[in-house]
Amino acid sequence: MITEIAYAKINFTLSVGEKRPDGYHSIDSVMHSISLSDTITLEKASTISLSITYGEAPKGKENLMVQAAELFFAKTGLAGGVSLTLEKRIPSEAGMGGGSSDAAAVLRGLNRLYNANVSRETLAAWSASLGADIPFCVLGGAARCQGIGEILSPLTPWADLPLLVIRPPVSVSTGKAYGELDKRHVRSDDTTISCIQAMKERNKDALQASLQNDFEAGLFPLEPVLQNTSTYLKSLQRPCLMTGSGSAFFVLPSNEQNQDQLYDIIKAAHSDWFVSKARTVE
């Protein structure tokens, strides 16, 4: 039996192109892994099965973890199965790659469990058929993600940046989010290059100035809860941004003491919100 940690991701930038002939959208994004995570245990078995001991997630073949296991055995030609156990802490439908990170962890875990010696890069390439965020989650750390998310340019991670993750009690489907962007034709300036430079220089002010997500302009008019969440978080006088297609946001505190203060303030004001302390990880 082995254990894999599935780290959530945030988008420091997310620019979305127009819809392509294949139905997908091209993106340009800086993604970073964070410490908020799910835990997955894997044990050899004759078939593929999944049990969830904490939190909620789809069961059976609807779950990307099961699909990832099927993909692994199909690609490697190995005979066998796996018993998967999930402890779920990453919020679902939050734009944090929760399902994607779980699938990525299954691929990495099976690679270890069966001593398959498949490279991370190959696992990432295989995973693109399951979901656009999964290749990044296989590799983790930090990267510029282009294409539909599968073209990765690794960046040096900026580890241990304190942050807060906030998710109001509203869900946003990714398909609906892209549909709203196409309908409204709203886009913001692409700050990805500025963000990459800020990360290279370890310039916090420049990083904060580069935060950008096209989905905010597309979704805020549709979901007042998201607009109100953003307005409230900005009133705390720290940089904040919605991640992915929502509905989670992250806030960048000035330091760990400020992180503790903001956590207490937000929890007291909004007891029905998911609020978690986290940090960036390598």
PLM regions: where:
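Solvent-exposed alpha-helices and their adjacent loops that cap or buttress functional pockets
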Residues: 32-33, 128-129, 135-138, 155-159, ...
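Conserved, helical-rich catalytic subdomain that frames metal- and/or nucleotide-binding sites
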Residues: 50, 139, 144-239, 254-267, ...
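Short beta-strand scaffold segments in enzyme catalytic cores
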Residues: 14, 38-42, 133-137, 143, ...
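Glycine/serine-rich anion-binding loops at beta->alpha junctions
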Residues: 85-114, 132, 239-253
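Residue-level recognition of strand-loop junctions within catalytic nucleotide-signaling folds
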Residues: 17, 252-255
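ATP-binding N-lobe of GHMP and related small-molecule kinases
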Residues: 1-94, 112-121, 157-158, 167-170
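Contiguous, small/hydrophobic- and glycine-enriched helical/loop subdomains that border
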Residues: 81, 103, 107-144
